[in-house]
Regions:
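Conserved ABC transporter NBD signature motif
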Residues: 62-70, 79
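Hydrophobic anchor residue at the start of the ABC signature
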Residues: 147-148
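Catalytic Walker B motif of ABC-type/P-loop ATPase nucleotide-binding domains
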Residues: 159-163
Length: 222
C-alpha cells in the first residue's frame, strides 16, 4: 500500500466516559479499495470506534487523519459525505422509503428520478413498489437495506458498517455482501465493518480483533 492510497490513519485512539474506559487505544490504517473488519466480544468498543471515525463521537485521546488531514479540522458535513456511517438500527426519516433515498439528493439540492431510485432498490433485491412503502411497515432487514442504500446514493470514499446485515437471512446477507464486494472492486470503495460472520471475515483484506479495554487490539490474518 502506498501513502497516496491511504485514506484513514487512526493513531492510538481511545475513549472514556465518566472515568470508565470504553475503548482501549487502537491504531489502524485504511487504504483505497480495502475492506477491514472489526471483530471482538461485546463491550470491546467496536461501535464506539466506528462512531469516532465517523466524527459522531470525540475521542478522549489519539488522532485520526483523512487523506492526511486531521478530521477535527475538516467541515463535519463534508467529511461525513466522504466517510459514511451505517447504523446497525438505521435512523429512517420522513414517511416513505422514497423520502429516505431522496434525502442525500435534497441535501445537495438535487432531485433523483424514480428510475434511479428503483434501480438502487433492485441492487439489493427490493421491488419497485417498495419506494412508496411507509417506513413503519418495513421489516428489520428492509430497514437495514434502505439505510445502506441511502448512504450509497452518492458514493462515499469510506463506508463504515455497524453490523448492517445482522437482521438479514443468509440469502440477503449474500446479496448485500456481493454488492459491497463489487463496490470495493469496481469503485475502489474502502470499508470498515463490524461482523461476526465467518464468510464476511474471510472476504476482508484485514481483520482487527478488539478485546476488553484492558487488553487493546490485535490484527489477525483474514
Amino acid at each position: 500500500m502506498t501513502t497516496e492510497s491511504l485514506l484513514l490513519d487512526v493513531q492510538a485512539v481511545s475513549y472514556a466516559m465518566q472515568g470508565r474506559t470504553l475503548l482501549a487505544p487502537v491504531s489502524l490504517q485504511l487504504h483505497v479499495g480495502e475492506r477491514l473488519l472489526l471483530t471482538g466480544p461485546s463491550g470491546s468498543g467496536k461501535s464506539t470506534l466506528l462512531k469516532i471515525i465517523a466524527s459522531l463521537l470525540e475521542a478522549s485521546a489519539g488522532k485520526i487523519t483523512f487523506e492526511q488531514r486531521d478530521i477535527t479540522t475538516l467541515n463535519p458535513e463534508h467529511y461525513r459525505q466522504q466517510v459514511s456511517y451505517c447504523f446497525q438500527t438505521p435512523q429512517l426519516f420522513g414517511e416513505t422509503v422514497y423520502d429516505n433515498l431522496a434525502l442525500p439528493w435534497q441535501i445537495r439540492q438535487q432531485k433523483p428520478t424514480r428510475e434511479q431510485l428503483v434501480a438502487s432498490l433492485a441492487s439489493v433485491q427490493l421491488a419497485a413498489e417498495m419506494l412508496d412503502k411507509n417506513i413503519e411497515q418495513l421489516s428489520g432487514g428492509e430497514k437495514q437495506r434502505v439505510g445502506l442504500l441511502r448512504n450509497l446514493q452518492f458514493m462515499p470514499k469510506v463506508l463504515l458498517l455497524d453490523e448492517v446485515t445482522s437482521a438479514l437471512d443468509e440469502e440477503n446477507k449474500l446479496i448485500i455482501n456481493s454488492l459491497i464486494d463489487s463496490l470495493v472492486r469496481e469503485k475502489n470503495l474502502a470499508v470498515i465493518g463490524i461482523s461476526h460472520d465467518v464468510n464476511e471475515i474471510r472476504s476482508a483484506n484485514n481483520v482487527l480483533k478488539l478485546h476488553a479495554p484492558a487488553q487493546g487490539a490485535e490484527h489477525e490474518p483474514a
